[in-house]
Amino acid sequence: MKNPIIFIIPLLALAGCSGGDAPLYKDPAQPAEKRAEDLTSRMTLEQKVAQMCQWVGLEHMKSAEKELTEEELHNNTARGFYPGITTADVEQMTRDGKIGSFLHVLTAEEANYLQRLASQSPLQIPLLIGIDAIHGNAQVAGCTVYPTSIGQASTFDPELVERICEETAAEMRAPGS
């Protein structure tokens, strides 16, 4: 071999192209406690507070935007709307990692869209998606609505209440909650 440098330079260049090690918090092989410590050590106070902020889903906001007047959109919190904040603002806040959770996300498509937005955030923390379903998934058309918790308790039938909970859970999983 006359000039070994011809082979060494490309190898060094390829070695320099590696993306580097992923942060510890993204390594599922690591213990949860270490991952949590690593993630929180990288977070600013604003990012930590944002993880505790829960907003209503975009489709819920869009329906309010259609039905409320311009004045109502900017001056009150009717239907869980945020005065002066549009769905586009919420989308950007999600991309920026300033929202940690959504409530009233009614479809798997919406949940997936929101998770894609969160994956663009600096730390790529997945969102927590929730919905109030204390007596069935009443927010989604076609789902079963059961009596409230006190009504269920008054049956004195724990097996019935357990079946209600199982059916509610199945109906909740369908749209991605």
State where each predicted segment sits.
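Generic cytosolic/nucleocytoplasmic N-terminal low-complexity/intrinsically disordered segments
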Residues: M1-K2, Q47
